Amino acid sequence: MQTPQILCPVDHVKMTFTFPKHELNSVIDFIINNVPLPATDKPYSVGTVTPDGRLDMCKQQLGVQGIELVASALKINQIIKHLLLGTNAFGNPGAAAVAGLLSENNTIETVYLGCNYIEQAGCTAICEALEENQSVKSVWFKRNPIGAESMPAIIKLLSKNKRIRTLDLVNTCAGEGFHTLLEYLENNDTIERLYLSGNYLTAPTMKFVSNMLSRNTRLKSLYLSANNIGDEGVAELLPGLMNNTSLEEISLASCGIADAGMELLFTSLKAKKNIKSLDLGYAASTKVLGAKANQLSHASANHLVEYIIEQTNLCNLNLGRISLAETHINILRDEIEKRNGGRLEMNGYQSKHTYTAHQDSKAIKSVYR
């Protein structure tokens, strides 16, 4: 049995920054004075401001004291829309500072907190601050050890705040705590994009995902990559996928799905026309999380081809690192690329088209990663 681990280089809280304090002054002045956004990316000694309103402070070694200074300045700012704070080691104390900011600022739309050693107390503080917030649309907790104990605070947040549409819980190791969240999401009508990748989820949890999909009519994108789903998990997941009519994107990359699961997936969903993007490829975190790549035999590849031909709305297909026969490669390439903007990624092949990312994903693009 695998021991869940957080895939993050930050394993403790850093109280202060490693650079001279005056290096923060220029970006703090920009924030406090509500300076208009630059025409091109504007790098400072610490951090970068972008034309679309991102304050990118990822990997700037802010620590608790640094994030407190930035958060305090942002309370009165009306220019910054997207706050990127990944990998700054500020933990629960820094999360409390961000919470204080979010309880006052109603301009920020994106809060990216990935990889900061935030635990339950910090997650709860963020959630409580967002309950009455009027502007935030997406919250990214990825790679923080918030655990199962944080699920009640997240559920309470979603029950009160109807503006949040993207929730990222990638590699937060909440285990069976996700079951409670999934039960709540059965009747949620606001979350459109849910990230649960890299959480060591197994077949029993897929039953909860399936139940959620059967009842939820709002969710458009579901990310389950790098989980231990396997063929058994696909069987548990399928009833929900078959009943659901709102889902447009699903990611099952590196979920250890083999022949039986693939055949079941393609044959059962052949009549479904709502899926536009399907990722069965290879997740970057596969090896470090102990996940398993997906496999396609010649027989299941035949079912895949039949499925894709039927799915005329599907315009993004990722089969990265999956071995396919030349005949299957040619058919899939011709089929996907004749679709307007169709994108296909296979072992040794990537189409020239780029699948258009959702605006919430664009908003967390960092110049530092």
Residues covered by each model-derived region:
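Leucine-rich tandem repeat or coiled-coil scaffolds
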Residues: 1-369
